[in-house]
Design a protein with these regions (language model features):
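Structured helix-beta-strand junction loops
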Residues: 48, 75, 148-149, 191
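Positions that flank functional sites
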Residues: 32-33, 185, 203
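GST-like fold's C-terminal all-alpha helical module
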Residues: 99-190
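GST-like domain detector, emphasizing the conserved glutathione-binding G-site
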Residues: 1-126
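Terminal-tail/helix-coil boundary detector
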Residues: 197-204
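Active-site-flanking alpha-helical
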Residues: 73, 166-167, 198
Length: 204
């Protein structure tokens, strides 16, 4: 398998899942600033020009966080990256979708690429503030769901990898994580696979 990623991005969550599952893969680092994701050879694999991408051994390219995480969990069930019981399993999927689609998609995108959310001459700072408010509110909602539990859906699952990269971003931009999210973030950072991934990606 070939894994296309950028250190410190949402692909960090997938990187964690690949390591947690003990899978063998070939990592390809894309420099987004240099436009590696827009080069013809990459667009031939992922026409959307986004990361992460996982090119499976059968030639199928998975080109978004949710599809990659779901495939890893379902293709390698012995790794127990999804709960077996219906209720916590649904919680894992719902939490992952909320983290990727709302916290990242609606919140952090406004913080990182505010120019995409307004016409020319728009108040960029106001858009960033709006993004921070979305992230803060969403993390409070997650905090209520965690209620002091170690992980989002019982044991470690794909939901925790999605939540972690958002917590990681919040930490990096100086946002204060609510108590249960902070405990989750610290617990995640203590996991061997997470420590390995952060070290490989140049973070401590």
């Amino acid at each position: 398998m070939k894994f296309y990623m950028t250190p410190g991005s949402c692909s960090t969550g997938i990187h964690i899942l690949l390591e947690e599952a003990g899978l063998v893969f070939e990592a390809h680092v894309l420099n987004l600033i240099k436009g590696d994701h827009l080069k013809p050879d990459y667009l031939a694999i992922n026409p959307n020009g986004t990361i992460p991408t996982l090119l499976r051994d059968d030639g199928v390219a998975l080109t978004d966080f949710v599809s990659i995480a779901t495939w890893i969990a379902e293709a390698f069930p012995r790794r127990k990256l999804l709960p077996e019981e219906p209720a916590p399993r649904e919680t894992a999927f719902a939490t992952m979708a909320f983290c990727v689609g709302h916290i990242h998609g609606e919140g952090f995108r406004r913080i990182f690429v505010p120019e995409r959310y307004g016409s020319k001459g728009a108040d960029i700072d106001a858009i960033k503030v709006e993004g921070r408010a979305i992230v803060a509110s969403a993390l409070l909602a997650i905090d209520c769901e965690l209620k002091g539990n170690d992980y989002a859906a019982g044991g470690f699952s794909i939901a925790d990898a999605a939540l972690f990269y958002n917590e990681f971003w919040a930490d990096k931009i100086g946002m204060v994580l609510p108590p249960s999210c902070l405990a989750h973030y610290q617990l995640m950072r203590s996991r061997p696979a997470v420590r390995q991934v952060l070290a490989e990606e140049g973070y401590r």
